[in-house]
Amino acid sequence: MKRIDELKDIIKGKKATEAPKAPERELPEPGDMSMSLTEVLMRRRSSLDFSDAPICDEDLVRILWAADGLNGKGNNANHRTTPTTLNWKEIDTYVVKANGVWLWVPERRVLSFVHEKDCRKDFCLLQPMVKQAPVHLVYVYDQAKTQGLMTDLAMQIV
């Protein structure tokens, strides 16, 4: 748990510091996927075998788009591919790779640099075989995005 607390501190530090601007990596358009949803669901399996081969940006952006991307085009691209309570967008997706920790920013399709340390082994806890996976996605609930709204909502109910 200490390692997770360290990551929380890293993330809090990232949010607390506005300057200097963190380096960003723009990712390509996700592109069309060739498999139907039915086929994807039929082929879905859990596996404990992980390759350490890097994931190319084209595949990574497709995974991130499915995990928390924007659907639609142009001005209509304001809805997430995943549900969010009252459109609060309270969950952030962090990409943990050998070259550090990055925040996924779906509105701009970029990875924003957070921390330079390779933290992948810190997320294995009871599954050490996971540490060789080239990418870990970490979902972080940002309570600050909902705190005031939840208080207002609770007051209306009472």
Predicted region positions:
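N-terminal amphipathic, basic helical "cap/leader" segment at the start of enzyme domains
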Residues: M1-A133
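Small-aliphatic-rich amphipathic alpha-helix that forms the alpha element of a beta-alpha
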Residues: R44, I63, T93, V135-V158
